[in-house]
């Protein structure tokens, strides 16, 4: 499952000073590729190219074809360091992907049917999201772009947990496997309803 392509060059000038010069003078981003029983490799990326890639949310949960000076590496984005004020990427970590080895990755949650949820449509409640992504473990071929959270049947006061999610075949939710059935979302009484109830009580 390779839908994204990124170009990189082997980096020989290492160190913090060299990294600063890359970002300042050449609009390039230092990065490292590791894992897969190979030595870590330092590379550089074009800032404009990786910024364009990251405009697509799916890039974070997809296998990426990284072309390094003519050689191809199949990787996942493992970590990004961003500028604290401006938000642009300052450094990237990529994990090599091996087809027959399980990997772990963070996958976004997509909440559906929120406007027709029982607790919203019938009881006037509001939905709160506790988490926006989950860590999964699977083979590279099974890595999902996202996992859906169907809110249609969720009632007022009800909490949706990891155990309520339907993970695709071959995909394991890491926290759930470790016994942590985290809350994902809930429907609670809206502030307007609460305030109206308080006013009515005071009037009586």
From Swiss-Prot:
GO biological process: translation
Cysteines paired by S-S bonds: none
Keyword match Ribonucleoprotein: yes
Residue stretches spanning the membrane: none
Protein origin, superkingdom: Bacteria
GO MF annotations, alphabetized: 5S rRNA binding; structural constituent of ribosome
CC annotations in GO: cytosolic large ribosomal subunit
Family of the protein in this entry: Belongs to the bacterial ribosomal protein bL25 family. CTC subfamily.
Quaternary structure and partners: Part of the 50S ribosomal subunit; part of the 5S rRNA/L5/L18/L25 subcomplex. Contacts the 5S rRNA. Binds to the 5S rRNA independently of L5 and L18.
Protein name per UniProt: Large ribosomal subunit protein bL25
Organism the protein comes from: Pseudomonas paraeruginosa (strain DSM 24068 / PA7)
């Amino acid at each position: 499952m390779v839908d994204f392509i990124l170009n990189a060059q082997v980096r020989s000038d290492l160190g913090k000073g060299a990294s600063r010069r890359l970002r300042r003078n050449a609009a390039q981003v230092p990065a490292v590729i590791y894992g897969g029983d190979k030595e870590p490799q330092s590379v550089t990326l074009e800032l404009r190219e990786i910024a364009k890639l990251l405009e697509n949310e799916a890039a974070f949960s997809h296998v990426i074809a990284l072309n390094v000076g003519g050689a191809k590496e199949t990787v996942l984005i493992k970590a990004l360091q961003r500028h604290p004020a401006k938000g642009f990427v300052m450094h990237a970590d990529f994990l090599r992907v091996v087809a027959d080895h399980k990997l772990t990755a963070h996958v976004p949650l997509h909440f559906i049917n929120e406007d027709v949820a029982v607790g919203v449509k019938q009881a006037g409640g509001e939905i709160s999201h506790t988490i926006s992504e989950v860590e999964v473990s699977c083979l590279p071929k099974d890595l999902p772009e996202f996992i859906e959270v169907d809110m249609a049947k969720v009632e007022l006061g009800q909490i949706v947990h990891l155990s309520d999610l339907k993970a695709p075949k071959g995909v394991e939710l890491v926290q759930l496997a470790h016994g942590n059935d985290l809350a994902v979302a809930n429907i609670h009484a809206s502030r307007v309803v609460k305030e109206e109830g308080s006013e009515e009580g005071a009037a009586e």
